[in-house]
Design a protein with these regions (language model features):
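Non-heme Fe(II)-dependent double-stranded beta-helix
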Residues: 1-30, 37-174
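Catalytic core of non-heme Fe(II) oxygenases with the double-stranded beta-helix
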Residues: 119-120, 144-237, 276-285
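A short, structural micro-pattern
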Residues: 130, 190-192, 260-262
Length: 344
């Protein structure tokens, strides 16, 4: 009888919150996620939460807030096919996303290089990795449940030699590859991205904590995107200050907030260095932030070369700096003959 991998079912074992690197790595291997207690101490938690709410309120006041998860909004569509004003309260948006937090406070930037989380990210991605996005989700009451998805949907699946491969540039967000029992003999991709979700208030079943499908990282498949979900998932429950780390192959989605208050999550997404980040830091970073950034932060923002990739000139430079005098078209002072001698 052929062995198979069954999807997680409600009531099956799940990780317990912990403060152990060893336990966290074990959880990541088996379940695809782990919950770290007290990732933010009390003072840091208050500082991050207050700065986030101040920024969020200011963006609403300025008319630039990104508001989604309304009943008639569908973020699974290709973003470049949607009008720019799709995600606003006027168009039914309920939750508020705050993007590009790297520019919006030192308390946010400090999380990019979190000392406890870094070894766990390195376990998944290796010693070289990039920040893909640093953002927040303020999930308000009334927001609808998000369809399940993975955060490395852009990875082509391993293909048998006799099948035509999927061209990488044709892959679309929200493609459905199937579910159910999984043949363990079929090859799957490694994790190439991961998420650290910092809980800025308690995540509960009632307020729509992120929903995950434990062990789905081993399926090698994209999840069915239906809402309500057609597979068993679990809403994350964690105390304020905790961090939920889950890898990029995990099936997950924002839960619906049925409480009477907002749920505040700050999400740091990382990817391997050969992949394109969601946020373009080399172009979008505030010059003052860049000038003050540590070498470690600059590396995670994509300013450090990786095996000569990301260069703007010399392939053996370590970091790229904004060129004040970029080299453009040049001609020698003299004309060169075919023999290589200069004409007088």
């Amino acid at each position: 009888m052929k062995e198979s991998i069954s999807l997680w079912q409600t009531g099956d074992p799940v990780p317990e919150p912990n403060r152990s690197q060893e336990q966290a790595i074990s959880d990541l291997r088996e379940f695809g996620y782990t919950i770290i207690e007290e990732a933010l101490d009390a003072d840091r938690l208050v500082a991050v939460r207050e700065r986030l709410m101040e920024q969020a309120d200011a963006e609403i006041e300025a008319g630039i807030a990104f508001e989604d998860q309304g009943a008639d909004q569908n973020r699974s569509k290709q973003y470049d096919r949607l009008p720019v004003d799709t995600f606003t309260a006027a168009n039914g948006g309920v939750n508020q996303r705050v993007w590009m937090l790297v520019n919006k406070g030192k308390v946010f930037r400090d999380l990019v290089t979190h000392l406890f989380m870094t070894p766990l990210i390195e376990f998944l991605l290796g010693p070289h990795f990039l920040l893909s996005t640093l953002s927040a989700n303020i999930a308000n009451p009334g927001g609808v449940e998000m369809g399940l998805h993975t955060d490395q949907w852009w990875m082509p699946r391993p293909m048998p030699r006799n099948e035509a491969p999927v061209t990488p540039g044709s892959i679309e967000r929200g493609e459905y590859y199937g579910s159910g029992d999984v043949d363990p003999a079929r090859l799957i991709n490694p994790p190439c991205a991961c998420n650290v979700m910092y809980c800025l208030n308690d995540f509960t079943a009632l307020n729509g904590g992120t929903r995950l499908v434990p062990k789905s990282h081993l399926t090698g498949l994209q999840p069915p995107p239906d809402v309500p979900h057609t597979v068993s998932s679990i809403g994350m429950e964690a105390k304020a200050g905790s961090a939920i780390l889950f890898e990029g192959r995990m099936w997950h989605g924002t839960g619906a907030n049925r409480s009477n208050g907002p749920r505040l999550g700050l999400l740091a997404t990382y990817c391997a260095p050969q992949f394109r980040a969601q946020e373009n830091y080399t172009l979008g970073i505030d010059p003052e932030v860049r000038a003050e950034a540590s070498p470690e932060l600059l590396a995670r923002l994509g300013f450090k070369l990786w095996n000569s990739y990301g260069r703007i000139g010399h392939p053996h430079a370590r970091y790229v700096n904004e060129p004040t005098d970029p080299i453009g078209e040049m001609t020698p002072h003299g004309q060169r003959q075919a023999t290589g001698h200069m004409l007088p």
